[in-house]
């Protein structure tokens, strides 16, 4: 018999359902996924579909990037790359069918962080409406793809908000050019104790990342069931 040992992970969407994340927690997610993208870069791979549904969490609270079903290896010429991914997190150059590179992943990760720091809403979606319609989403997509600058995410402090907006800049040349530069910007803010956004919840302390108690309980239950 052949046995394959794999790390047990659970979908980010399941573990964090109903939990408001702090800046520190969202920053940890960003830093962990930047490291994932750094490794992708070493293998010359573009993920092309970074979104909350493709993020996973380990029993130790580390964030992982999964679902490489439409990932593609970088080539010397990018002209043959296809328009793949999820429109809600797609970079403008990919949406327009133009040549693109690994900076589309930086853009998508920036949008993930934006959503987590903006009442779980992507740019240009009304924060006051309880129900977001298909037309709302289409209008928001149109504004984003037209080059309109998104407002800062409401739950992020000024420094963190600036980093997020730079990551999801309309022009790829204005983004962080590599995942390590994105990660370094996040680590710099974390090192100097970022200010909380006006709506953010205060939770945890010290320099480490303290996971919400509800999340700890979910992880423990899942791991016990898995090993039973």
Predicted segments, located by residue:
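Activation segment signature within eukaryotic-like protein kinase domains
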Residues: 29-30
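Conserved activation segment of eukaryotic-like protein kinases, specifically the C-terminal portion
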Residues: 80-93
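Conserved short submotifs of the Hanks-type protein kinase catalytic core
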Residues: 1-12
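Conserved catalytic-loop aspartate of Hanks-type protein kinases
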Residues: 105
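Protein kinase catalytic-loop region centered on the HRD/HxD motif
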Residues: 35-45
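Conserved HRD-motif arginine in the catalytic loop of eukaryotic-like protein kinases
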Residues: 175
């Amino acid at each position: 018999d052949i046995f394959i040992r794999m790390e047990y992970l659970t979908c980010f969407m399941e573990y964090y359902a109903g939990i408001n994340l702090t800046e520190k927690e969202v920053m940890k997610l960003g830093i962990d996924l930047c490291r994932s993208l750094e490794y992708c870069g070493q293998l010359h791979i573009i993920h092309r579909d970074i979104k909350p549904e493709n993020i996973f969490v380990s029993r130790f609270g580390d964030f992982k990037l999964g679902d490489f079903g439409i990932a593609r290896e970088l080539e010397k010429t990018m002209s043959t790359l296809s328009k793949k991914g999820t429109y809600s997190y797609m970079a403008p150059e990919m949406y327009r069918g133009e040549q693109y590179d690994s900076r589309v992943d930086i853009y998508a990760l920036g949008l993930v962080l934006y959503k987590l720091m903006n009442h779980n809403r992507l740019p240009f979606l009304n924060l006051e409406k309880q129900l977001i319609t298909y037309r709302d989403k289409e209008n928001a997509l149109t504004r984003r793809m037209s080059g309109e600058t998104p407002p800062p995410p409401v739950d992020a402090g000024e420094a963190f908000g600036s980093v997020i907006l730079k990551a999801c800049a309309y022009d790829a040349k204005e983004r962080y050019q590599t995942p390590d530069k994105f990660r370094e910007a996040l680590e710099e803010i974390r090192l100097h104790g970022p200010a909380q956004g006006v709506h953010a919840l205060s939770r945890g302390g010290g320099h480490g990342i303290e996971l919400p108690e509800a999340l700890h309980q979910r992880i423990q239950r899942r791991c016990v069931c898995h090993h039973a």
